[in-house]
Amino acid sequence: MNPFPRAEISSSALQTNLAALRQQAPASRVMAVVKANGYGHGLLNVANCLVSADGFGLARLDEALELRAGGVTARLLLLEGFFRATDLPLLVGHDIDTVVHHSSQLEMLEQTVLSKPVTVWLKVDSGMHRLGFTPEQFSTVYDRLMACSNVAKPIHLMTHFACADEPDNTYTSVQMAAFNTLTAGLPGFRTLANSAGALYWPQSQGDWIRPGIALYGVSPVTGDCGANHGLVPAMELVSQLIAVRDHKANQPVGYGCFWTAKQDTRLGVVAIGYGDGYPRNAPEGTPVWVNGRRVPIVGRVSMDMLTVDLGQDAQDKVGDSALLWGKALPVEEVAEHIGTIAYELVTKLTPRVAVCLA
């Protein structure tokens, strides 16, 4: 077996997760969010596995064009919209929807000559204060879009939650109320719910939900696990032991002699490091799954390798598999040890890691 790390992507897990989310929001269509290379799972891999999704959400135009070139015919939505007037003919030519969240985009729509109108999702800033038009701006912007011949009718409406991943935080209710009041009586689709909205705020589900991380089997909520919602990890990040060595008590290991053994033990060296996207700041004790058990990282993660304490009586050998995260070792647990979020772990894998459908 190739000793280098690989991300094995389960098509059945992706399909299971889509079905679970449909069950959570039976009245809603699903806009599967596949930005950032399908959250590190491979853009076309994910889209081809999720052919039954009603649409796909993306961050960048090149992602949408890659899906169209790959034969994807479903609705595509640019969640950050377009950035240049020259993008607009590409949206028209490839039948790509766009979010409009800024006055510069509105002006480009008004000033560009297009062969047919573009489908627009007008983004309301209901309280996240990142992208979108404020309630005070909304009516004027909506009227201008309605008057613009380059905009298909009806105009669809959306917002994004700041704190939906905190189920006890009432700010999500405040945002929902603001959005619903502002858009009451208007035609078009409505979409509010991201993964956390779909799982924890059913009243936010609307016409479309926009799940991202949950599609990949991961909970959006710190301290929670996707399995609690019927989700299955879609990624198994796997490498192997490239060395197993006896190690004496009171001897250090790794750069900076950061860790010293308290007793005689056996160490395993795993072929993965920060050059592959595994975080350098993973602290001592971060778990790795080897031969049916958790073993702790010891010493510093280096560019190509990390070291684990296999234990004094370990029988592990060179070539044995090491799971960095996956079904047996949830990525949420690893992220909590490292002090980050699962989103960051799965999206930061570098091109050295082979991504393959398993």
UniProtKB/Swiss-Prot annotation:
Its cofactor is pyridoxal 5'-phosphate. InterPro entries: Ala_racemase (IPR000821), Ala_racemase/Decarboxylase_C (IPR009006), Ala_racemase_C (IPR011079), Ala_racemase_N (IPR001608), Ala_racemase_pyridoxalP-BS (IPR020622), PLP-binding_barrel (IPR029066). Substrate binds at residues 130, 303. It catalyses: L-alanine = D-alanine. One of its GO terms (biological process) is D-alanine biosynthetic process. CDD domains: PLPDE_III_AR_proteobact (cd06827). NCBIfam families: alr (TIGR00492). This is Alanine racemase. It comes from Shewanella baltica (strain OS195).
